[in-house]
Each structure stands twice: as C-alpha cells, then as structure tokens.
C-alpha cells in the first residue's frame, strides 16, 4: 500500500509530508486517516519537540478529494487534532493551497510559505461554502479582510496571506526563514510549549465546541444539493458551472 504521508526526523523535529501528488495532495479519506495516525504517534512520542507539516510536489493541498471525500466528522477531528496536539505544528508551504488545505494551514500554530505559494478558497465556485474549515480559520484571521476571498474564490499571494493572518512569514527561501523558528522550539521546554500552545488555542477550541456540529451539518447539506453536484461536475469536466454569467 502506498504511503500518503512521508515521515522524517531531525533533532527532535518530525516532518510529515503530504505525498499524494497524483491528486495534488487532496484530502481523501485515506490521506486524512494516515495523517491523523501520524499526528497521534507524534503526540505520544517524548522525543518529538515539534512537527513540521509540508508536502511533495507543487501543491500543499488542493482541498477535499471530490472522488474520495473524507467524512466531514473525520475532517473536523483532524483539524481539532492539529490544534490539540501537545507539540507545536509548523506548516511549510512551497506551492498551491486551496479550499480545505487552508483549513490545515489555519490549524497549524505557525505557517511559513515561499514566494511561489498561492492560496484560494474555491468552495463558492463549486456551489458549497468553506464551512468546516471556518472552525480554525475565523478565530485566527480578520473575517472582514477574509470576506473578499471567501465570497469570490479569488487567488491571493503570500504577502496577502500574511496580512490576513493565515501565514506567520513568507520568504524566498522558506527553510531559511524557518531555521530560527525551529531552533527556538528546540530550545524551549516541552511542558512550556504544550501549555503555551493551550493558551494560544483556547479560543479556537471554544469555536469547535460551539460550532462544529452545525458547520458539519451545513457542509453535508450543501454537498447534497443540485448546485454542488453541478459545481463538482463542472470542476471535474474543466468547464464553467451553469451559473457562471
């Protein structure tokens, strides 16, 4: 069976690489399950000080796999797992991030992207809403600034992602930018990192507790509609949806 998540370790930092380039690292049921299992192991391993979440290929994550979508509850659980993991999680992006991939990005504690990265909330263009991924996104960003991209599906660049609060830093050389960050995490006490992360994520988890059930239901309802079926079919057939004017 092909592994969908690569794993390496260097000086107590575990790197998890989304490795399903044939689907542009789309969130399939299998990839979500494998990533969740890897995170669970990292959370229990005392030799893991921090986790880097990155990717192979030119796309960090294309969002949900429309041919093999994950269960909405499983996606909520994965996002919550990233937030509750007692290790800092650092996103390292050198490519495109779309739709559900932005949920992964928002669930990480820190995020860095190279100048080649691009971002888009493409849900509205296939007839649905960025429902489940709003759980980590809206508490960590400026909703007013985010509204343009939520409502239009426009692409935006790393500098704009920093302004919105999606990214911590952008640089031509993302590894050079992350080097002092990872060094700082290696110098920090494990219990201090865990408790400091709890302080930083408390408000995000309140949103999960309050809204996860309703947003999961909204997502399921929207994906079952005629407009969503048309939008997904149009996407797979590489044509405009019927409502485009």
Which residues fall in each region the model found?
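Well-ordered beta-strand positions
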Residues: 95, 109-110, 148, 152-154, ...
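Conserved CoA-thioester-binding segment of acyl-CoA-metabolizing enzymes
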Residues: 1-56, 179
């Amino acid at each position: 069976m092909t592994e969908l998540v690569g794993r390496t370790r260097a000086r107590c930092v575990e790197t998890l690489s989304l490795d399903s380039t044939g689907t542009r690292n789309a969130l399939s049921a299998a990839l979500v399950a494998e990533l969740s299992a890897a995170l669970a192991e990292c959370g229990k391993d005392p030799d893991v000080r921090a986790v880097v979440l990155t990717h192979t290929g030119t796309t960090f994550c294309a969002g949900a796999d429309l041919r093999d979508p994950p269960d909405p509850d499983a996606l909520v659980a994965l996002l919550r797992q990233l937030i509750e993991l007692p290790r800092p999680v650092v996103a390292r992006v050198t490519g495109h991030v779309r739709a559900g991939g932005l949920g992964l990005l928002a669930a990480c504690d820190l995020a860095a992207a190279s100048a080649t990265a691009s971002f888009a909330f493409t849900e509205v263009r296939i007839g649905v809403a960025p429902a489940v991924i709003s759980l980590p996104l809206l508490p960590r960003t400026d909703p007013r600034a985010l509204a343009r991209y939520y409502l239009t599906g426009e692409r935006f660049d790393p500098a704009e992602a920093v302004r919105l609060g999606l990214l911590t830093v952008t640089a031509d050389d993302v590894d050079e930018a992350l080097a002092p960050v990872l060094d700082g995490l290696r110098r920090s006490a494990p219990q201090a990192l865990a408790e400091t992360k709890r302080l930083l994520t408390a408000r995000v988890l309140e949103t999960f507790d309050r809204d996860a059930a309703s947003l999961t239901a909204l997502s399921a309802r929207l994906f079952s509609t005629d407009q969503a079926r048309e939008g997904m079919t149009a996407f797979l057939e590489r044509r405009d949806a019927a409502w485009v004017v």
